Amino acid sequence: MPKMKSHRGACKRFKVTGSGKVKREKMNASHILEKKSRKRKRNLHQSTLVDASQEKTVKRMILA
């Protein structure tokens, strides 16, 4: 059987941390920013962790 291919889109969006958790960037931070408050925009540029219920699925996609 051939090797499994990783999901290239997922590989660009997710990174696995040293402890094995999956890190992601927040959405809604790239355009249409005028109406969003400074505080909201600042918080959108902080990375966050993938929810525990989705972690197994994401790891399978990126073959980590």
Swiss-Prot record:
UniProt superkingdom: Bacteria
One GO term (biological process): translation
UniProt key word Protein biosynthesis: no
InterPro entries: Ribosomal_bL35 (IPR001706), Ribosomal_bL35-like (IPR021137), Ribosomal_bL35_CS (IPR018265), Ribosomal_bL35_sf (IPR037229)
GO molecular function, one term: structural constituent of ribosome
Entry keywords, A to Z: Ribonucleoprotein, Ribosomal protein
GO cellular component: cytosolic large ribosomal subunit
Pfam families, A to Z: Ribosomal_L35p (PF01632)
PANTHER family given in the database record: 54S RIBOSOMAL PROTEIN BL35M, LARGE RIBOSOMAL SUBUNIT PROTEIN BL35M
Stated family: Belongs to the bacterial ribosomal protein bL35 family.
NCBIfam families found in the cross-reference section: rpmI_bact
Protein's UniProt name: Large ribosomal subunit protein bL35
